[in-house]
């Protein structure tokens, strides 16, 4: 696989973007047989994966990736619970920032359900735009994490207008870059190769290089903060476990999706297990923040049967 080429990736993994990018090479058999110079002017179906999870028909509605959809629905409700718990920690560091991040993840889950499950069918006029929005939201989440990682060094005060403006700016920048590069690639507004393959170099670079660098910044910052600053090794374990789940999910999606699909008789593919691992990674991300922060209610009042007291021993009521 050459850098910037989605043909091998899409032949092994049924990513939503594969329906809107084209390649002159199509791998059509499970023994990796490749057909070159396909008539893409006639067969304009994107890059077809060798194996993918079968669809089901419910009330005359075709639903794709039903297993992956189930995991994303679970993730949707789990994120609602996480957002509620984040909002409850009133004085915790990064409360507003992490709340906004998880809210963005919630919107990403909604668009993932739309493009993965066939709510907007591949081939429809709206599909390239919806996939671009999904990729834009994924990029926004990655870019926000780089800011959240730096927040642990207290370079600026959390929850302030400056802090939120920086977070909004980074998320907007990540969304715009990923969305624009995606839609320009899908609609082929800049150039078209002579063999009619989609030029995906820019999209590949943004998705797998720039966004990955943002994630790397977040991981490095959190490890430094948890080990050197907080000396909280439970938090360190949480982030390492999250990294493990995330990497495992990517490997299952991009390397073993065909094997899983064939082994499961087309009922599940790598997308199911990849989404499950990503869900665990998000849970570990939240757990790391939860263990690294306290609800410092210095002037909270507790009431017992005899008298009023506070958690600050210097203050008496």
From Swiss-Prot:
GO terms for biological process: cell wall organization; protein folding; protein transport. The keyword Membrane applies. It holds the Pfam family Chs7. It is a multi-pass membrane protein. Keywords: Cell wall biogenesis/degradation, Endoplasmic reticulum, Membrane, Protein transport, Transmembrane, Transmembrane helix, Transport. The chain crosses the membrane at residues 63-83, 101-121, 133-153, 164-184, 204-224, 236-256, 266-286. Coiled coil: none annotated. Chaperone required for the export of the chitin synthase CHS3 from the endoplasmic reticulum. This is Chitin synthase export chaperone. It comes from Kluyveromyces lactis (strain ATCC 8585 / CBS 2359 / DSM 70799 / NBRC 1267 / NRRL Y-1140 / WM37) (Yeast). The lineage of its organism: Eukaryota, Fungi, Dikarya, Ascomycota, Saccharomycotina. The gene is CHS7.
